[in-house]
Amino acid sequence: MSKAVLFFADGTEECEALLVADLLRRARVEVIIASAMGRRALVSSHGIHLNADALAEDVDYSDVDMVCLLYTS
């Protein structure tokens, strides 16, 4: 199975970010949402609270096939 890491931060555009995660998961790609903020609790650009799967520094990148850097405002 392919594996992707999506980096989220405070200010992430939630529709764009969650759409990418959803499409990858539908394609049976393992998706890890990683926080680039040093904490798992995040707030999107429109004030929606999100929880990352892991902190970016804790992810094992040795078998990652794709990394997505998402827009933040």
Regions found by a protein language model. Give the residues of each.
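Extreme N-terminal starter segment of soluble prokaryotic enzymes
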Residues: 1-4
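Short N-terminal binding/cap micro-motifs at the start of the first secondary-structure element
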Residues: 12-17, 41
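A generic structural motif
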Residues: 28-32
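N-terminal beta-loop-helix "entrance" segment that forms/cooperates
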Residues: 34-53
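Conserved small/polar residues in nucleotide/adenosyl-binding loops
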Residues: 71-72
